[in-house]
Amino acid sequence: SELLRIKLLDKSDVQNQTKEKPAYKKYFSHGTSHHLGLDTHDYCDLDMPFEKNMVLTVEPGIYIKDEDFGIRLEDDVVINSSGDPTNLMKNIPIQIEEIEAIMNNG
């Protein structure tokens, strides 16, 4: 719905999408997550249940080729002993105003 709101997609894009080629893939060319460990991209069985101390990324992004623009925000989360995720990046600023303030006061 956000891509519709900012007019990167229109209703016909959504109506004509297929399961194999969803409309959002025009602007999102990678996966949403991967395991993180000794290697930057650790690979595990995707059907494996989460376990304590597993670390995964959460990587929403958008890439607008016509404007040579792209951005991806990454959070890294660890599965804690209760099985819930803990965001390891929670204190890192990601809001526009926070980043601009840091840049202006650099």
Report each predicted region and the residues it spans.
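Charged, cofactor-coupling segments
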Residues: 32-106
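Active-site cores enriched in adjacent His and Asp/Glu residues with nearby glycine-rich loops
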Residues: 1-33
